[in-house]
Design a protein with these regions (language model features):
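Eukaryotic intrinsically disordered, low-complexity regulatory tails and linkers enriched
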Residues: 586-615
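C-terminal motif of bacterial Sec signal peptides marking the signal peptidase cleavage site
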Residues: 21-23
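Bacterial N-terminal signal peptides that target proteins for export
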Residues: 1-13
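A gly/proline- and charged-residue-enriched helix-loop-helix capping module
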Residues: 159-162, 173-179
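Alpha-helical solenoid scaffolds in eukaryotic proteins
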Residues: 469-475, 507-514
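Primarily the internal scaffold of c-type cytochrome electron-transfer domains
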Residues: 26-32, 36-39, 46, 54-123, ...
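Short coil/turn segments at helix-helix junctions and helix-capping linkers
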Residues: 517-523
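Core register positions within helices of long alpha-helical scaffolds
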Residues: 492-495, 530-533, 601, 609
Length: 615
């Protein structure tokens, strides 16, 4: 995806550069790395650390700082131990040769060995890139397996996206120079060679790419620092040329700082694409993002051919983003922004708190919202009609539900709005209430909301997916939804906040077991995780060990055996423990066995569209 525009002008005076080096004790840049540049006013985080040691240290522990790295024993997370990873007839064998990290590949009938030159990611999974020379340029290409940090195992790259099973390892190829470079680094300059030729990117383009810094560093958010560093010890103390501080900007410019990456976008006007792929995006912190790019919305036309629905599929039917990297679009569509002064730093802190969420440590739980909504904060239970210390009184659970897919997990929506059962059901969007009350239907949610908050809440006329209205919303999404809806439901069923009546305790496990046979590996992975979580959290049926043995990447025949074996084990355990009889709408018979005929009818309703994430 992209970013964009100019802000701080460089002052290319050697004298000032010398002053800066002596004034701040600047250490030599690591320009020994041929990927690094010092153009357009960028100086690198080492120059910032000389004066801002605390801020540098707090940034260095974030996942922003380790987003892109060179391979080393300290930075590589994957086990390059010589074990083979296979999919179909293809295979990859990661191994080490001294300080080098390599993969022996057999892909599409071609055998070769690739050396890892770049790493992308360090939190949920880590991807690996090789360098290939193309005539007078070079490009970095993604290798076909990645290391999943939580699972502690190798996975085919295409298995973590929203797509069906692949026959081999050749899918989801990506070129770093046209994609990852733009957001996962500081001061990207893709360096497209021959840019005066017809400006259409195609396989075989040559690049001489550089970045100011690998990873997302100080100047990504504060702007190029050359003038600031050069004047840091000016005669009149405190008169150093200022860098940008996002929390001091007006709201439009403040959200743009994060939106340059957390807001999927297109160059605007389109002819600016050539500039993007030569000298890099034009946006600089402190500017308005929309002066440089067009953020992608549900109705944005797809340029240059391709699937005309590609962008629309990245949103729920009401326009709410359902993929990561669209947080900007969610924020600017929220009334907290349009009618208030919400910015990213209202809730997030880049130099404080847990690096995993980077939430402000001075605001705990609902304080993120009650810092503005003070009246509600005085009596939360009166507003929520739930116990004040329960999940039903969580502002985030209701107004920023987990309905966004990305990096092999589900995340919170950044479109802050009110739950609406009619809107959600008719738009195919998972409903906040039934993400906790996983055994309840949308009409049930509408009745409760109408009782508590007025007649404006109603049940949907029909569901977007065509499933019966009286079916639990989670089950309908899990079986009849498209891949994004199924992934959201699979995660919701395993959340600590998920509640269900005793007559659904067996059904929830059975639903997840069936979903472990889903045709899309990313959905199977999440269903497996949730079933194990339910077994740990709720009185165990004793099927956790059996579920643990099911490999979500096994072949279709083996998966079928595993799933039916797991369903048999669930039914037998329920009978042995005299579990409560399943509810009539739970898709189970009195013998605790799944009503497969009804489930198959629901799966026939599934949307089969490929939801292209663009990575």
């Amino acid at each position: 995806m992209r970013a964009s525009s100019p802000f701080l002008t460089a002052v290319p005076l050697a004298l000032l550069a010398l002053v800066a080096a002596s004034a701040c004790g600047g250490e030599p840049d690591a320009v020994a790395d041929p990927l690094l540049h010092r153009e357009a006013g960028y100086v690198g985080s080492a120059a910032c650390r000389a004066c801002h040691e605390d801020q540098h240290a707090s940034w260095a522990v974030t996942h922003h700082s380790t987003m892109t790295q060179r391979p080393s024993a300290a930075t590589v997370l994957g086990h390059f131990d010589g074990a083979t990873v296979a999919q179909g007839k293809d295979s990859a064998r990661p191994f080490r040769d001294g300080e080098r990290f390599l993969m022996e590949l057999q892909v599409g009938g071609v055998a070769r060995t690739a050396e890892v030159e770049l790493l992308v990611g360090s939190r949920r999974y880590q991807q690996y890139f090789e360098r290939r020379t193309l005539r007078d340029g070079a490009s970095f290409f993604r290798l076909p397996i990645l290391w999943h940090v939580e699972l502690h195992r190798w996975l085919p790259v295409d298995s973590v996206f929203l797509g069906p099973d692949a026959d081999g390892l050749g899918g989801h190829a990506a070129e770093w120079n046209t994609n990852c470079i733009l957001c996962h680094n500081t001061g990207p300059r893709p360096g497209l060679l021959g840019a005066d030729e017809p400006a259409r990117l195609q396989e075989g383009n040559r690049f001489d790419s550089h970045v100011a810094e690998l990873g997302i560093a100080c100047e990504s958010c504060h702007g190029p620092g050359e003038r600031h560093v050069a004047t840091a010890r000016s005669v009149a103390k405190g008169e150093a040329h200022a860098v940008v501080h996002p929390d001091e900007l007006d709201k439009e410019r403040a959200v743009a700082v994060c939106g340059q990456c957390h807001g999927a976008r297109l160059p605007e006007p389109p002819r600016r694409a050539r500039e993007w792929f030569t000298t890099g995006p034009t946006f600089r912190p402190g500017e308005k993002l929309v002066d440089h790019v067009k953020p992608i919305e549900r109705g944005t036309p797809v340029r240059g051919g391709g699937d005309p629905e590609a962008f629309a599929l990245r949103f729920w039917g009401d326009g709410t983003p359902r993929l990561t990297a669209y947080e900007y679009q969610g924020v600017v569509a929220s009334q907290c922004y349009t009618k208030g002064e919400l910015t990213c730093t209202s809730c997030h802190a880049m130099h404080d708190g847990d690096p995993k969420g980077q939430l402000r440590p001075d605001l705990v739980g609902n304080q993120l919202c009650t810092q503005c909504h003070e009246d509600i904060g005085k009596d939360v239970a009166a507003h929520t009609r739930h116990a004040v210390d329960g999940a039903g009184s969580s502002c985030l659970a209701c107004h920023m539900p987990k309905v966004v897919f990305g990096v092999a997990d589900i995340h919170r929506s950044h479109r802050i709005d009110n739950p609406d059962p009619a809107r959600d059901g008719e738009a195919g969007r998972p409903h906040a209430c039934t993400l906790c009350h996983v055994d309840k239907s949308l009409p049930w949610a509408a009745d409760a909301m109408r009782r508590w908050w007025g007649e404006r809440y109603r049940a949907p006329q029909q569901r977007f997916d065509g499933a019966p209205l009286d079916l639990a919303d989670a089950a309908a999404n899990l079986f009849a939804g498209d891949a994004a809806a199924r992934a959201v439901a699979a995660v919701a069923l395993g959340e600590p906040t998920a509640t269900f009546a005793p007559d659904h305790a067996v059904a929830v496990r059975a639903w997840l077991a069936v979903t472990m046979g889903d045709g899309w590996p990313s959905v199977r992975l999440l269903a497996r995780r949730s079933l194990l979580a339910v077994e740990q959290r709720v009185g165990a049926l004793g099927v956790g060990a059996r579920a643990q043995t099911v490999d979500h990447l096994a072949g279709v025949e083996q998966r079928g055996k595993d799933v039916f074996g797991l369903l048999d084990a669930i039914a037998a355990a329920a009978r042995d423990r005299s579990a409560p009889a399943p509810a009539s709408i739970a898709l189970l018979g009195r013998d605790y066995r799944v009503d497969l005929a009804r489930v198959v009818k629901l799966t026939d309703l599934q949307g089969r569209n490929l939801i292209a994430i663009g990575e």
